[in-house]
Amino acid sequence: MYPAHLLILSAVCVSLLGAANIPPHPLNLINFMNMIRYTIPCEKTWGEYTNYGCYCGAGGSGTPIDALDRCCYVHDNCYGDAEKIHKCSPKTQSYSYKLTRRTIICYGAAGTCARIVCDCDRTAALCFGDSEYIEGHKRIDTKRYCQ
């Protein structure tokens, strides 16, 4: 390919990205996924923590069925408070953090949306790492057990 073609192709790609309004930082959910991977046992994947219990995954209702499900319940409420009280957008808020010595450090000024959301994710990820994963609580019948 000729250098001029590469230049035109690059310009088209840059303008398409700008038109699509794609944020320059990864979405918060990617950060949360990485935190979870860091704290859970090696034999588990972060995906096994979706559709677990009554609250791990989209939505949630009823009483959490175990300690791990309570982690998700608390996380959902933390995101809810971030939205209602602080006017943040937790699922898309980018933030800075560091994974070190089996813990997670959130950066940024206290009270900012970035720090609030990071603290929500940090608390949940550490809770996941400290909670037992019960295979029978994956993909439960939420209509039956989560009312």
Curated annotation (Swiss-Prot):
The active site is at H75, D121. Its cofactor is Ca(2+). Disulfide bonds join C54-C146, C56-C72, C71-C127, C78-C120, C88-C113, C106-C118. Residues 1-19 form the signal peptide. Binds 1 Ca(2+) ion. SUPFAM superfamilies: Phospholipase A2, PLA2. CDD domains: PLA2c. SMART domains: PA2c (SM00085). Residues 20-27 form a propeptide. Keywords: Calcium, Disulfide bond, Hydrolase, Lipid degradation, Lipid metabolism, Metal-binding, Neurotoxin, Presynaptic neurotoxin, Secreted, Signal, Toxin. Expressed by the venom gland. GO terms for biological process: arachidonate secretion; lipid catabolic process; phospholipid metabolic process. Ca(2+) binds at Y55, G57, G59, D76. Heterodimer; disulfide-linked. The A chains have phospholipase A2 activity and the B chains show homology with the basic protease inhibitors. Snake venom phospholipase A2 (PLA2) that inhibits neuromuscular transmission by blocking acetylcholine release from the nerve termini. PLA2 catalyzes the calcium-dependent hydrolysis of the 2-acyl groups in 3-sn-phosphoglycerides. This is Basic phospholipase A2 beta-bungarotoxin A1 chain. It comes from Bungarus caeruleus (Indian krait).
